[in-house]
Amino acid sequence: GIKEADATECILAIKAGEADAITLDGGEIYTAGQHPYDLQPIISEKYGSGSSCYYAVAVVKKDTGFSFKQLRGKKSCHTGIGKTAGWNIPIGTLLTTGQLVWSGQEDLPVESVSTFFSKSCVPGAGGLVGGKLCTLCPSDCSKSATNPYFGYAGAFKCLKDDAGDVAFINHLTVPASEKANYELLCLDGTRAPIDSYKTCNLARVPAHAVVSRVDPELAERIFTALTTVTGFSFFSSAGFGAANLMFKDTTQSLVRLPDGSNSFLYLGAKYMASIQSLKKESDQPITPAIKWCAVGHAEKKKCDSWSSFSVSDGVKSVACQISLTVEGCFQRIMRQEADAMSVDGGQVYTAGKCQLIPAMVEQYNQSLCSSAGTPQATYFAVAVVKKGSGVTWDNLRGKRSCHTGLGRTAGWNIPMGLVHSIHGSCDFGGFFPSGCAPGSEPSSTFCRQCAGSGSGVEDGSKCSASSVEKYYGYAGAFRCLVDGAGDVAFIKHTIVADNSDGQGPAWATALKSSDYQLICPGGVGRAEISDFASCNLAAVPSHAVVTRQDIRDDVVKMLLDQQRKFGIDGSDPLFRIYESKDGNNLLFKDSTKCLKEIPSLTTADAFLGTGYVNAIMSLRQCPETASELEKTCISSSCSTAE
């Protein structure tokens, strides 16, 4: 073991290879994950009832008579500067509730805090604002055990000794024997007993985690070392004259995190937004452009032209970010490098697991655009075959399949959910021996029939989940059937009509829709393409725009404004958001008539509806059906609401 004075020195030692790991609090995990350290969380603490989260709370003595909304001028006890429950959450909350205000560009959060509370003990803040945040600390203001008011137990002691009026700690800090004398301050201005922390807290935050360099083998060795030590009580600090040494004393076990985990996925979108709000210099009134996330170059090209048309009074409403996949975009939105994008329902499900929310929904029926009320939006997932091929739902086993993409609604979740429920098997590769489902592992049988960019060179485009793969998306999956690369295409009900009988891009105009048929699930039924209402796999939720909670209102406002200008009958004829010149369904589905706002605070699951969510959950019983990102978001402690 290597002993350093504080966390930052340990982080540097790990980066340099002089040490391998350290347990950190969320706020420190944020720092460790930033450039130039680039460390990753590898193991998370788990507390009681299998939860790897805890609650940040504001604790006060009973009968002291003030509420969370009356904290100005009080004396405050904190676990340490930059720590989650002790600093980032309470100060971030005071900021977002408007009690604490930045006064100007040069002014830092610590300045505002030092004038907001009359006195404080914030361990580690000795060098800031002339030590004003240390006036309550008894001797030294260090972020270590020599300061009696450091850490959870210390901040509670500061309150107990009557040095402070309020302590910012976690829900497990107050000893059982003392609970009766203390209360929690709730955000709504009321008080509650200490055990009501689930309903009266400032935030639910990720567990402390062990952080190391990015090196899966090292991570495995560390996990083994920590989980095989016997005869030594890791999680108790009793006998060492202090609390929470190495691990929090309330830790019951350790959990290995997926290799793809990193600090922002682990901390989650909400906590990241909290930290970012502490980092910004002042509340600037200028609303910067909303950063749209484009997948691949064709989308980026359309986005760039949207961006240039979105300029009014010299200010852009839309800026563009690019990623190679939808999930890459989700990560950028979570990191605040991008703000929004429109995605398929199956991807809305994943976004929800990563704390993103649906803000607007694509509507495909003009009459719904003018009507008030909750947006109604569904389309039909269908299975298309060539007429005369003899393919029916009953003899699908052994055929070659064309999918819009792995994890997408019409292309994967609905058909594979049906295959799973009818045949009870998770062996999709055994059912369809080869196919094209862009986004699958390159070695998978579901990449065999994909075509890539068609350039004939190994450019990594084959099976990629973006428009560089010729068979990606709705039109791509239909084209895979047309070209004879597959026997059945799982797509949306309008796609054949959109790409035949003179409609669609060059490859499609000469096709006849009458050469294709729908097959109906669970039998030998077949139907004409136009009979989708009676012969479909499911009616499913529309594509939706996903974003972060903290920027939702700005995204909705921008889109409503852009739609007035560039929608179907927008005021500016120079650009149309719902048309794709160099491809299909770029940024939005081409069949979109308008976007409608989804009521605020609607979760991804509520938007998708129980029927569809249950279909996905059933599919998730099969291994390999959840993407790496989704698995990481779910295992990253606090992304799932209790």
From Swiss-Prot:
- Alphabetical list of SUPFAM superfamilies matching this protein: Periplasmic binding protein-like II
Q: Which residues are glycosylated?
A: 365
Q: Recorded GO terms, molecular function? A: metal ion binding
**A Pfam family that the UniProt record links to this protein:** Transferrin
Query: InterPro entries, per this entry?
Result: Transferrin, Transferrin-like_dom, Transferrin_Fe_BS
Cysteine pairs bridged by disulfides in the record: 77-158, 121-137, 186-200, 293-329, 303-320, 354-633, 369-594, 402-480, 426-622, 436-450, 447-463, 520-535
User: Where can this protein be found?
Assistant: Secreted
Record-listed hydrogencarbonate 2 binding positions:
404, 408, 410-411
Q: What is its main location?
A: secreted
Q: Which residues form the Transferrin-like domain?
A: 1-280, 290-621
Q: What does the subunit comment say? A: Monomer.
Give the protein's recorded name.
Serotransferrin
Q: Which organism is it from?
A: Gadus morhua
Q: Which gene encodes it?
A: tf
